[in-house]
């Protein structure tokens, strides 16, 4: 019951998220990825509060000035580059609810590299992605509401994730024309990625970060792709993917 009180699911846009009011962040963001969502609008930089969530629960990291304290970037969970078909779609990725305090080198390095790898696996069928953050034991904290070295009087403590993850699912052929629910287990492929939140990764992506969806479910306690057969979620075959 307590978890239900502090968490809320947002479904009324082109992605779905589970937002945690105490963490001031989404624990996961789920979204379809297809060419219909990508175009030439580019980054709107439309940093704003999420209109579907009370502002007191959101990190104050919106507007042109407000950021997290010190070395933390405003890290997207659904990437801006995954929603460039229209300015409206792109602007929704800049809501504060989609941000977490992310180390700048991690954000612009290994995480950006992984985001690019995910896009390389787009196909005629839809690619399904869930991006999330995990707060392990001993997580640190930062503050929101900073502009330069100055803090807003209403600045809040914001937990910093210890890990980030992605799980992805698509048809093997990429052009089956079938919904996932119409596919047998031999027609689907899935994989996950689990990264410790630190700043000393090499710039290039490595398959050592690959895990099964089942592994990430065990780490986080969440169930992803609930209608998909278990044998698909046990897969961890990097050679099946463009990585």
Q: What residues fall within each predicted segment?
A:
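Short, His- and charge-rich active-site/binding loops that engage polyanionic ligands
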Residues: 13-77
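Domain-level detector of nuclease and nuclease-like folds
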Residues: 57-243
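Generic preference for hydrophobic
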Residues: 8-9, 30, 129
